[in-house]
Curated annotation (Swiss-Prot):
Swiss-Prot/TrEMBL induction comment: Differentially expressed during meiosis.
Disordered: annotated segments: 1-22
Biased composition (Low complexity): 1-18
Lineage top rank: taxon: Eukaryota
Biological classification of the source: Eukaryota, Fungi, Dikarya, Ascomycota, Taphrinomycotina
Protein name: Uncharacterized protein tam12
Organism: Schizosaccharomyces pombe (strain 972 / ATCC 24843) (Fission yeast)
Length: 66
């Protein structure tokens, strides 16, 4: 019986660690996307781009955050 309990505890901990790691990766990707978005916005404003051009640029970044 203790083998089943140990196995269950191990798989629960493994699932928890896996979920934690996945959440960490998602948070890191979101932060990088935000930093990229901010950089692009500041750059566009410094270049005196028109607001519609800035909007188009931001939409492209949000649609494809790579």
């Amino acid at each position: 019986m203790s083998t089943t309990s140990s196995s269950s505890t191990f798989s629960t901990r493994t699932a928890s660690l896996s979920q934690s790691y996945t959440n960490s990766l998602k948070k890191e990707a979101a932060q990088k996307t935000l930093e990229n978005w901010e950089y692009q916005a500041i750059h566009a404003l410094q270049n005196n781009s028109s607001f519609p051009a800035i909007r188009r640029s931001m939409r492209k970044i949000l649609a494809d955050p790579s």
